[in-house]
Every structure is written in C-alpha cells, then in structure tokens.
Amino acid sequence: MLVIGLTGSIGMGKSTTARLFSEAGVPVYDADATVHAIYEGEAAFLVEAAFPGTTVNGKVDREKLSAKVVHDAAAMKRLEQIVHPLLYDYRQAFLQQAERSGAAVAVIDVPLLFETGGERSVDAVVVVTTTPEIQRERILARGNMTSEKLKAIQARQLPDAEKRKRADFVVDTSHGVDAVRTQIREILAAAAKMPRRRS
C-alpha cells in the first residue's frame, strides 16, 4: 500500500482536498480530527496536568490551551510531547486497517508534516496550495481567526514555496473543486507507479 502525506499551509484548501481524496475511495486519516477526539478523551488528563486550568468537564478547552502555548515555544514543545505519541498510535492503527481492507493507497492528512519530520514516514507528499489572495480570503472568512493567532500559526509552518519545492505532487486549489478532482485522479495514477520509500 502506498502512503501519501497530504499537507499545506493554513487556508490552502487541504481539508477540501482530503475530502475529495476520500470521495475518490481513498482512506484518509485526519490528524486534526484525531487531535479533537483525543482532547475529549485520553489526552485531557495529561494536558490538564501539564497546563492546569485548560480543561472543562474532562475535555480540553482549545481556546484556553491555545492561550497558554501559542506564544511559548517550550510550552508548545511540551504539548507536542503529549499529543504526538497518541497521534502516532492512531495513525498506525488507521494504516493497518487500510492495508487490511485492501486499499492500494492511503492518505494521511497532517498539517505540520514537514515541520514534524513526518515526510519520512510516507511514500509521497502532496502539498496543497493556492494564491496568496485566495489564502488570505479563506483565512479571514474563519470566524475565530485573529491576526495575532494567524501570525503564530504561520510562524510554526514552513513557507508555502518551501513546501512546494519538497513535494512530490502539488494540488492547486485556485481553480475550483472540479480542477482539484482532476489533479487527484492524476496523482493517484502516477502514485500507482511509484516505489515505496517509507523509512
């Protein structure tokens, strides 16, 4: 089974691209959704122990947690040390299930794939991109986004140009969903011929 890592900076259209891979019959692991789930389950106690006052009724309050870690690199590192092992276990279980089901390709959707060294655990990397204007429009359309929060997120992400240089495939979401579907079909056809390179 070929494992594709799907990544892209904020506002590039990665979630839509992941959904379209899924619609094409490809199993997709969503790291963000898994984080949401573990914040309501097994990570809550660990997060509260490391960052007191960040849980409510046994669930992580993302806004309270964000306020404690967004501008503190050491705190962010501590949070990652809690979350990443749990995410790894879920991702491995997903990949085993996908392989057992006979999938030829599986996608892992990881926003910080390059930033965490995750590209070494996949066979190919797809980077999702768009124009800076469309990216900005999408980001500002999010009700909970502030310029301060955006700057903090962007500071943790590799620049789009660097991600595109390191990608095996680039999906441009600037031209609508049908264009993205076409690009996904082309990627899946090309990926079927690629050698496996996971370490």
Curated annotation (Swiss-Prot):
Record flagged with keyword NAD: no
PROSITE patterns: DPCK
Pfam families membership: CoaE (PF01121)
Localization per Swiss-Prot or TrEMBL: Cytoplasm
Domain spans labelled DPCK: 3-199
Binding-site list for ATP: G11, M12, G13, K14, S15, T16
Keyword Transferase: yes
InterPro entries for the chain: Depp_CoAkinase, P-loop_NTPase
Disulfide linkage: none
A GO molecular-function descriptor: ATP binding
Pathway(s) where this gene product acts: Cofactor biosynthesis; coenzyme A biosynthesis; CoA from (R)-pantothenate: step 5/5
EC supergroup of this enzyme: transferase
GO BP, sorted A to Z: coenzyme A biosynthetic process
EC number: 2.7.1.24
CDD domains registered for this protein in UniProt: DPCK (cd02022)
GO cellular component: cytoplasm
Keywords of this entry: ATP-binding, Coenzyme A biosynthesis, Cytoplasm, Kinase, Nucleotide-binding, Transferase
Catalysed transformations (reactions): 3'-dephospho-CoA + ATP = ADP + CoA + H(+)
Family: Belongs to the CoaE family.
Main function: Catalyzes the phosphorylation of the 3'-hydroxyl group of dephosphocoenzyme A to form coenzyme A.
Full protein name: Dephospho-CoA kinase
Species name: Nitrobacter winogradskyi (strain ATCC 25391 / DSM 10237 / CIP 104748 / NCIMB 11846 / Nb-255)
